[in-house]
Swiss-Prot record:
Organism: Treponema pallidum (strain Nichols)
Polar residues composition bias: residue spans: 49-59
Protein's UniProt name: Lon protease
Similarity-based family: Belongs to the peptidase S16 family.
Composition bias type Basic and acidic residues, residue spans: 1-24, 65-77
Amino acid sequence: MAKNTDIEHDAHEPAGHGDVRESAVENPSASAVSDGEERATFAPEVAPQTDTESAQGAAQESEPEVQRAGEAEKGVPEKAKAVVPLDELLPQKVHLIPLTGRPIYPGIFTPLLISDEDDVRSVESAYSDSGFIGLCLVKTDTQNPTISDLYEVGSVARIVKKINLPDGGLNVFISTQKRFRIRKHVHHSKPIVAAVQYLSDLIEGDPLEIKALVRGLIGEMKELSENNPLFSEEMRLNMINIDHPGKIADFIASILNISKEEQQRTLEILDVRKRMEEVFVYIKKEKDLLEIQRKIQNDLNSRVEKNQREYFLREELRSIKEELGLTTDPKERDQRKFRALIDSFHFEGEVKEAVESELEKLSLTDPNSPEYSVGRTYLETVLSLPWHAPEKEEYDLKKAQKLLDEDHYGLENVKERIVEYLAVRKLRADTKGSIILLVGPPGVGKTSVGKSIARAIHKPFFRFSVGGISDEAEIKGHRRTYIGALPGKVLQGLKIVKTKAPVFMIDEVDKIGSGARGDPAGALLEVLDPEQNTTFRDHYLDLPFDLSHIVFVLTANSTDPIPRPLLDRAEIIRLSGYIDTEKVEIAKRHLVPKTLEKNGLKRACVSYRKEVLLHLVHSYARESGVRGLEKSLDKLHRKLATEIVLGKRSFDDKCLMDEALIGTFLGKPVFRDDMLKDANKVGTAVGLAWTGMGGDTLLVEAITIPGKASFKLTGQMGAVMKESASIALSWLRRYSAQQRIASPNWFEKRAIHLHIPEGATPKDGPSAGITMTTTLFSLLTQQKVKPRLAMTGELSLTGQVLPIGGLKEKTIAARRGGIKEIIMPKANVRDLDEIPEHVKKGMVFHLVESMEEVLSLAFPKGKRVRAGTAAQSASPETLTG
């Protein structure tokens, strides 16, 4: 393919006319080629000559130069030249050269760069044959165009001169002569040869109208060229010298900034009048574009002038200040900024003295010294804190209650306590802060409850965790003497929320550590204590700051590791685990929509029946919270999304999730009901335990081995639990001897092994005392414990059942595990009121005071004591939920 390098470099430059006009001035022959009509000047066979009176002078004037060029190229004597009409000399078959830029109009002298090997061979062949080539524009840019990729109308051009390039290409100087239309294809592929039909301009209509159109075109172009520096004076002169209307239209079209398609359309118009009218439209577009450019240029000039004026004024002002000694530097700007902030806060007492002193020291310090940077950072920190008094709280208690209900399902006791707290706060009109400690297993919503409190009272929320930290500087900051010192987390949070009365959540206070760098728990005491936090001193700030307006919300999994002084300062709200029905509702309302959106699925893509969600909870997510349930749902929806992407399912088809599909996606159930089956054996009993993760059921089992008397305990029991096991064995031996349940030497001839499964999990506490005693009694009497019965209670050495803790969590765990009856200490009867009614519904609670009562309930049909002694035992009290 051929490229016109002038066109490629500047879209506003006419197609080869920059070179044409320059050649026309310096070389008369070029002018003759451009302005001559229906004639060709070439060597060796013919000599240039016109057949019209108007063109004869130009042809004669250019004849010597063209003849010399012909002799130089062809080596033919001057006498061999002749004058032949152009139409007779133009070949009927031409080699076609594809053009990629723009079409080239007739009457143009321009260079062409030929780089394609096939095109080079085509030019060489045409040069040695007729000396003419056909130029056709490519419709779309392709690597190897064929004749079908070319427009049918093009220009035939005479090869004036060719120069071989070092890379094998050609630089060809051509003179275009006339339009043609491809009539027949001789060679479809390169080199492309076609039979052509030559086209002449059609001039129809009133000559005066044609003349008026010519004058109009020239006038429009004159106006356009005067305002456009891209149009040279030489172009304007050449345009005026052209006397043919069609060539004037061609010339103007070639120099306008229009698309190659528009230029091709102009090339194909043979009616000169229509061609000139088409060019008028293009000139109008160019003038509109030029007007927009002029407007943009004027705007830019105005901006530049304004910027230059401001620059000169600033320089002048700087010079004046230098003369008067009033130069403003960064240090002065810092002084003004800090002074304005200090005045706006109206500091008093120690704080005012400290910031004034620091500002004065800063004014005497070199800005390039490290001390200046330290002082400036300190002042920026002090002045970025919210020192102003907090605004009065305004919130609607009903809306707050509604907000809590929207954010959390269940947790009725927790929400009730929070609403009570907000009601008291509203009645007292007190903006003072408070300390709330949310205690519960992971995943029950402690953090989200804290966020809901902040939303309910319209306060900003800030959260940070103290789990694992062992440096008190995290709470109280570093002293300024250290490089890179920073304030503690509390003041950093206040800088972020920009108010003195936010809601601060301090997570994982039960996991706070201590080490060589101080005790963070002790540092928290000063932060939380209402008697001290009105004048809290951060190590970095070293100024009193009032923290008493902050609402502190602490979270923990257990209160056991928390220091007692810290517990005394907080109002404890316990969040127990969820039962299965609550988890199902939480999944339907929150978790299913959340995980569907997370995995790019629509709500209508999946449908869950209640019993399917219940199966998912029961088999894969029995923990106290709902994080495991969320992970299971997330995995289900990931698997479903994968099948949709792989084409195994349609995105629009609704998936009805069932137990089989859950098993396919999640694998075998994580939890099984084997515990109740295992408990229905001699030497087993089910107890209830409470941990930081919530309540849980505990299977206790025992066996005897003939041999020397011994008592072995396994299952990672703690010291307290081992003591409970020893008490259980001692009481049972005494009770068996009194009631003559077994022979006196039964214990002497057997080794007893008591075990609690899940040996990898540490276990401790006294509440398994009655469970271990019941297990040993079952082993002694070879009786099975009543099915679906669980128990909890501490046993004393005299057989009394003592109260325990965590009854609510244990009851929830029992319901989750399918337990129907619970034996519990009578002293814990008050704790039943804290258990929600929907948890107690359908369950039976046996309140006992002695171990004899426990045995009478655990073995209702078996022999417990020797005849005549049962009446000595009190009857247990039974409550139904």
